[in-house]
Amino acid sequence: MEFTKMHGLGNDFVIVNGFGQSLPDDPGALARRVCDRRLGVGADGLVLLLPSAAADLRMRVFNPDGSEPEMCGNAIRCVALYARRRGLVAKTQLEVETLAGLIRPEILLDGDRETVRVDMGRPRLERAEIPMRGPAGPVVGEVLDAGERSFMVTAVSMGNPHCVVFGADLDDAGFRKYGPLLEVHPAFPARTNVEFVEVLSPGEVAVRVWERGVGPTPACGTGACAVAVAGVLTGRTARRVHVRLPGGVLLIEWPDDAGPVYMSGPAEEVFDGKWVRA
C-alpha cells in the first residue's frame, strides 16, 4: 500500500490514494497499526481518498484508536493539496465529501507558497446537534463537573463535537488530567474534542486541544473553528481571529451568525512510502 505522509501544523496524517490501489476491508484496524509511532509509520490519523458521486472526491479519516471522526480540518487541507499535486483534480476550488457533509477547500497561490482556505460550513449550536445530553437550545457558558473541578463550557459542532473552555488556567498536568475527563463526560454521548483557550486579545487566542480518540495534538482545524465561534458567542473575540496552537497559527473567520466558518492555513508533504505489512 503506497502512502504519503503529510501534516498541517504538526497534526500528521498517512494519506492513502484509493483511486489507483485496493484498500483494506478494515481501515480502523489498519489505522491502529499504521498510526503507531513505534511499530508503524506514526501519525495522528489515517486518511483514505476515495471516488465520490457527490463531490470531487471522498475523504475518510481514522484515528489511532481506529475510530472514524466525522471531519478533520487539518486533514482536509492536506487532502486539497495532495489531490491537486497528484492530478486527482485540476482546479483550485474543490468539493470533498465527508461524514460531516460537503467541505469546500480552496488552494491559494502566492508565488511558490500554497495555503488552503476552507469553507467549513455553518457551525451547529443546538444541543442535539453537538450531540450533548440535556434540555434543548445552545450550550453557552454551561457548568460541567470533571473530577474535583467545575468548568464553564461552550459546545459547538463543526461536523464533530467540541467542548470549548475559556480561562481554565491549567498547567500541563491539569491539561492531561481534565482533557480526557471532559472527552468522555457523560454529557457527550459520542465523546468530544476539548479546547482549553486563553484569550490574548479580541483577535488572537492561544489554544491547547485534547482530541477525541487521539489525545494532545499540535493542531486541530475544526477545534480552531469551534473556538472562534465560541469566542463570538461569549463576547470574548472578534469574528476574525488568529488561533495559536502548539503547531502554529490558523486564521479563522466567521463573518456572520447565519454563514459558514472559514479556516486558512498551510499543509506540507513530508515523504512518500510503502506499507508492506500484511
Swiss-Prot record:
Keywords (A to Z) from UniProt: Amino-acid biosynthesis, Cytoplasm, Isomerase, Lysine biosynthesis
Name of protein: Diaminopimelate epimerase
UniProt-listed Enzyme Commission number(s): 5.1.1.7
PANTHER family in UniProt: DIAMINOPIMELATE EPIMERASE, DIAMINOPIMELATE EPIMERASE, CHLOROPLASTIC
UniProt subcellular location: Cytoplasm
Principal EC category: isomerase
Active site feature: 72 (proton donor), 220 (proton acceptor)
GO MF terms held by the record: diaminopimelate epimerase activity
Designated gene of the protein: dapF
Similarity-based family: Belongs to the diaminopimelate epimerase family.
Residues involved in substrate binding: 11, 63, 73-74, 160, 193, 211-212, 221-222
Organism field: Desulforudis audaxviator (strain MP104C)
